[in-house]
């Protein structure tokens, strides 16, 4: 979510929205042609401040470990599994969102563990990941692994040529190169999807709480009344084909 995050936005910071349900839907068997979710994995986020008596909203100093005293604004998340075949809901686990890359406040994201250097390049193994990312990969019972946080946008597409120029360029250009996004990743056991060599459908949705406006108090003042009803506001399937 939140693509095209400019790394050089200074003190501004992107966060997950705690008023949004982020859901990953998996369709199996006869649910695939209907686009109907067989199993849904829901991410919900909570935001906490260690201190509200400061102008330094996000960081109070150099962060040595995720969720330490210097990471003032900290987000946690809960992952819930909804099995629509059985009508059951179960909690998979909870995790912590690592800090965004903020230069000197988060030095371990950068080359040589120096916040003034460029960000580390991509790696091939988990052992090569930076310290914050390693700490933010959570393993849960029954074979689940999850991560949620800021990452380099891995989607490659020549957006300008497709939408602006209406023709393909050779060679193409990576329109997302150098920009970040907020990623939610969940590894599930193959047995949960029916084993090896399965055809599955996957799509994602975001939903918000319905928030109607009412001025029934008779004082000419608009009141926001939050109802416990979730409304889907976005759906993402195959990028550039079903969005």
Spans of model-derived segments:
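Surface-exposed extracytoplasmic segments
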Residues: 1-243
């Amino acid at each position: 979510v939140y693509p095209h995050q400019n790394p050089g936005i200074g003190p501004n910071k992107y966060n997950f929205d705690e008023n949004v349900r982020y859901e990953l839907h998996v369709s199996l068997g006869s649910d695939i042609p209907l686009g109907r979710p067989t199993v849904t994995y829901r991410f919900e986020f909570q935001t906490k401040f260690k201190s509200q008596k400061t102008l330094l909203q996000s960081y109070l100093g150099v962060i040595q470990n995720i969720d330490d005293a210097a990471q003032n604004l900290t987000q946690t998340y809960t992952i819930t599994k909804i099995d629509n075949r059985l009508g059951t809901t179960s909690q998979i686990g909870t995790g912590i969102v690592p800090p965004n890359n903020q230069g000197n406040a988060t030095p371990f994201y950068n080359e040589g563990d120096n916040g003034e250097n460029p960000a580390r390049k991509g790696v091939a193994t988990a052992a090569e990941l930076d310290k914050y990312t390693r700490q933010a990969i959570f393993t849960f019972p029954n074979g689940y692994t999850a991560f949620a946080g800021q990452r380099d946008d891995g989607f490659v597409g020549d957006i300008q040529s497709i939408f602006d120029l209406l023709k393909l360029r050779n060679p193409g250009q990576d329109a997302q190169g150098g920009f970040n996004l907020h990623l939610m990743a969940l590894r599930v056991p193959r047995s949960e999807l029916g084993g090896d060599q399965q055809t599955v459908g996957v799509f994602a949705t975001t939903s918000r709480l319905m928030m109607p406006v009412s001025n029934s108090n008779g004082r000419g003042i608009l009141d926001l009344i939050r109802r416990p009803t979730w409304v889907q506001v976005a759906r993402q399937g195959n990028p550039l084909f079903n969005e």
